Amino acid sequence: MARKIKPLIYVFCEGESEIEYTKYLKEKFEDVAVIQKPVKGLFEVADKKFKKDAKYRNNAEVTDEIWFFFDVDDGQTGSWDRIQKIVSTLKKLRKKPNIRVRLLMTTGCVEFWFLLHYKKVVPSIQTVAEKENILRLLQNECPGYVKGDSNTTRKIADHFKQASINGDWVLGLSLIHI
């Protein structure tokens, strides 16, 4: 029986916490996917790497997915029109089927996603004070958490199944109000 080829996934992140979380996923799911070491940077970085870096360019035809892990409202993503063009270009690097591009976006801050690993919450995350409150709530659940800390990020990531359930719950609430 032929061995199944694992999907190849490249990940681009904006912050240290996202990088640590992705490293956890890479180790946790190494039996089902080849997740490359995450790179700090988003759309322009990915575009440049797949155009100029031989490691990326030469693997484009065997790349299954490209993930972008970022906060939506921090202003670092730039123009959505420009992003859409880059995503379209990246998808077409592989002929058939195209590369699947996933936008793993958090609203406000990644700590909101991390908090969903513990409980169902729908906090306001508009101001700096509200983001600091999310951080405090997360630290109540995972004492010692600071952005980019590998140990606490891994403790949080261990609860990824609960985060998925709680995230679906949050999305269900937002659909009710449409």
Q: Where are the regions that the model predicts?
A:
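Helix N-cap/beta->alpha junction signal
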Residues: C13-G15
